[in-house]
Amino acid sequence: MAWVKFLRKPGGNLGKVYQPGSMLSLAPTKGLLNEPGQNSCFLNSAVQVLWQLDIFRRSLRVLTGHVCQGDACIFCALKTIFAQFQHSREKALPSDNIRHALAESFKDEQRFQLGLMDDAAECFENMLERIHFHIVPSRDADMCTSKSCITHQKFAMTLYEQCVCRSCGASSDPLPFTEFVRYISTTALCNEVERMLERHERFKPEMFAELLQAANTTDDYRKCPSNCGQKIKIRRVLMNCPEIVTIGLVWDSEHSDLTEAVVRNLATHLYLPGLFYRVTDENAKNSELNLVGMICYTSQHYCAFAFHTKSSKWVFFDDANVKEIGTRWKDVVSKCIRCHFQPLLLFYANPDGTAVSTEDALRQVISWSHYKSVAENMGCEKPVIHKSDNLKENGFGDQAKQRENQKFPTDNISSSNRSHSHTGVGKGPAKLSHIDQREKIKDISRECALKAIEQKNLLSSQRKDLEKGQRKDLGRHRDLVDEDLSHFQSGSPPAPNGFKQHGNPHLYHSQGKGSYKHDRVVPQSRASAQIISSSKSQILAPGEKITGKVKSDNGTGYDTDSSQDSRDRGNSCDSSSKSRNRGWKPMRETLNVDSIFSESEKRQHSPRHKPNISNKPKSSKDPSFSNWPKENPKQKGLMTIYEDEMKQEIGSRSSLESNGKGAEKNKGLVEGKVHGDNWQMQRTESGYESSDHISNGSTNLDSPVIDGNGTVMDISGVKETVCFSDQITTSNLNKERGDCTSLQSQHHLEGFRKELRNLEAGYKSHEFHPESHLQIKNHLIKRSHVHEDNGKLFPSSSLQIPKDHNAREHIHQSDEQKLEKPNECKFSEWLNIENSERTGLPFHVDNSASGKRVNSNEPSSLWSSHLRTVGLKPETAPLIQQQNIMDQCYFENSLSTECIIRSASRSDGCQMPKLFCQNLPPPLPPKKYAITSVPQSEKSESTPDVKLTEVFKATSHLPKHSLSTASEPSLEVSTHMNDERHKETFQVRECFGNTPNCPSSSSTNDFQANSGAIDAFCQPELDSISTCPNETVSLTTYFSVDSCMTDTYRLKYHQRPKLSFPESSGFCNNSLS
């Protein structure tokens, strides 16, 4: 042992005495023992190559923590044997520890058991998988994104394959999958080399990757996705940049004649982009890897070659025997040809590769049993220490086993062949079954990706059920979502069965806890798309914020209304806490109005029910309102309701039945007040804040309707109650919140309450005093100014929208969309939505709708705010006005009680009393899914609408000032009217809205005169509109709810007689006459 003495001699120089093939220079490199009967050569070869891979060795060294499985812990066994490689003075080391760990890990699959020969390639792959589960136990091997996972950060190739027909252009759906070894048939490789030579091309090492790609797709033809008859090759695209690429060579025979040809054609450099049809990672596009290791098979035995980096020598490992071959690759080729070694695995590594990041790695060793128990105690399959994206269904303890059960049973198909072939039958059958197994494993990987997609769809419906069940416990639900979802990219809420949605994200983000880095990279659009996956696909407008859908408290990582609310909460007492509006979502099912009524009553006292005033400004900032009908076909619940409406379009005629119950439901102003706030929250909870974007118009159900002159008609259909009930109560609420602190405002509110009481008691008083109107106007103006100072475009009262009207809003939107088409007005839908939502609130406060708008001190404030909301130029205002007016006419006529509050806010601040018809019907209950839209059959019937459209166009040239200062006949009526009167109502509203387009005058006379100016267009409606304040108004608080009513509700209320007040018959009767 002279070399040992020399090695121990101080100052000994190995380089001077190096002899190729001698043992002297190999002293630092250890062999692995393989005692008779152990048959561990397949394992020894894999371990030796892993040790020689600098990237793997350094990565394993820096990882200090892992989940340990005791005797079955391959991670511990590798750590131990690597430490022995580094520090032991023994020439050969036993590999018993890792062999026992491998056998214990796969005892259920009966793989790699003691004393049995097995396949080195499969051993290598399975060891990588085991290493993954020790480092990142909570992640599926196909979905791992941990930066500390050696397996996926260094070895895994993330691919997708797709077929594209060059003949017809059809393409198949891309199938993503992950693989650790790219298998190539040696026969196909040699054939490709021969074809290249036939083309008189000289084989170059840089062409090796292209040859491998060609061999990989040889004879791999698929049918055209469109069945055009063409046979096309599969395309495989690499999406990441692995630092170690493993090529597996599949032999058709143990004694193949191609051995020498294959060995000679192997290249020591691999150009990564040439190996695939395309690479998407920028680093991969220029990645060139070097051959650093090779495992060979010969005569039922495995051996390995590895490139020793420090000495730049090729080393040969044959169990305990370690020999240095030389510095040149030719020496290895000669050895292989001479000994008839068949290359089995080729390891190409990035020479500049580095160790994995420990940023998200475990810091200590944790026993598997402890880890499993803690995970089970958490009850939500959440990783204890490690952050994870995707968790398996049955918890952490079973995840590794699930992966094994998923993948390894396929290995059993060929394991028996492989076992006996190693013992004497030959390598050919094993290799043939091996490539079959590779394909099966690849298929399994694809199935995993498909299952993940299916799981998303499943969870989308499960999420609805979960949220519906947890509606009463939103606070606790939010905490659970915070904890459970902060680790998931997909951001799906926890499903009842413990499934987590894989891959999207994006509106359910971690709340208050912050998302992890791999979570933060998820695009917002992807997040919002996932959340809305339950309904039809939609493209969110750039400025659109998703509220009520995003289950967030502070909107971390998302620019949502909820996050805006949290920022504006200090500025506006009326800002709604949309961050808490997470419980209610419209379900894609037959809607039960009764259940919704009881639901709204339960929510009356919820602290989360605050007026919402921020939804409109947020949504209004998007300039592309004209495209919104296309971009936002579904606003969460909109499409669900819209679908029901489409199904029941024919039944939209019976609008009377909803009123009967409504008259009984609303008992007083207090109830209306509670409902106003309550509905507001329900609407925000259901995510309807963004429904303003549904149509091309910029208005929201809450948003005030701009009548012809730009005066805002607050058609808040919050509740089919006394005209002023909701607005007054809202004003009262706002006042209580500090929006209006002046005593004068308090007096105004008190006056309103008294008026409402009188109205509800018997509607004895048939007209409001001008003083009352002025007070209301002043109060609302003040309130609006407060909101304006707070940066809000509209007071909260005008934005308080009941859930009922959310539904109605969406239903109405759909119908209004139909209705607006004849008029070529893209804003009508949006305005109608607003009207439909507001019509329930007969009380029309121009200023409350948009107090700042009515104030003529801000000449263009109305339009400026409205245009800001709409994101439109002032020139488009007439369209908005037109639609608004149409809406108003429709709703005003549809509403039996017409409360016309005319107060023109002039630049001098003088408010002129408006015409006010005061016969108010009793408060009505919330019609959650009432449809106030006009049937399609009626959209063509309202010819005055077209005429009014022309009038609006004519008036569209009015200056902004005139628009903002013009008096608005805010004809506020209960939104529910008989279907018969929809057309007339619409016309009336158009006529009424048109009057503001006439010379800006806020006086009643001017209003009447303006109404008269429109007489040519709507004669019958004009009569009713121009009625004096003392004239009675008929109560017609009916609206079309057929499309959203359940059969039970329809049967119960359909036969209820219409409510009518003799004295109030004037308005609607005149309109009908």
Swiss-Prot record:
Sequence ranges assigned to domain USP in this UniProt record: 30-351
Catalysed reactions, semicolon-separated: Thiol-dependent hydrolysis of ester, thioester, amide, peptide and isopeptide bonds formed by the C-terminal Gly of ubiquitin (a 76-residue protein attached to proteins as an intracellular targeting signal)
Outcome when changing P242L: In PFIC7; uncertain significance
Tissue: Expressed predominantly in skeletal muscle and heart.
EC number: 3.4.19.12
Record annotation: effect of changing H132Y: In PFIC7; likely pathogenic; strongly decreased ability to catalyze deubiquitination
Gene Ontology cellular component terms for the protein in this record: bicellular tight junction; cell-cell junction
Outcome (variant: H132R): In PFIC7; likely pathogenic
Signal peptide: none
Binding site for Zn(2+) 2: H132, C144, C149, H152
Ranges where the record places region Disordered: 391-437, 485-636
SUPFAM superfamilies according to UniProt: Cysteine proteinases (SSF54001)
Chain intervals with Polar residues compositional bias: 407-418, 553-563
Outcome after substituting C41S: In PFIC7; uncertain significance
PANTHER family xrefs: INACTIVE UBIQUITIN CARBOXYL-TERMINAL HYDROLASE 53 (PTHR22975:SF6), UBIQUITIN SPECIFIC PROTEINASE (PTHR22975)
Binding partners and assembly: Interacts (via the C-terminal region) with the heterodimer TJP1:TJP2.
Disease per UniProt entry: Cholestasis, progressive familial intrahepatic, 7, with or without hearing loss: An autosomal recessive form of progressive cholestasis, a disorder characterized by early onset of cholestasis that progresses to hepatic fibrosis, cirrhosis, and end-stage liver disease. Some PFIC7 patients develop hearing loss in childhood.
Protein name as annotated: Ubiquitin carboxyl-terminal hydrolase 53
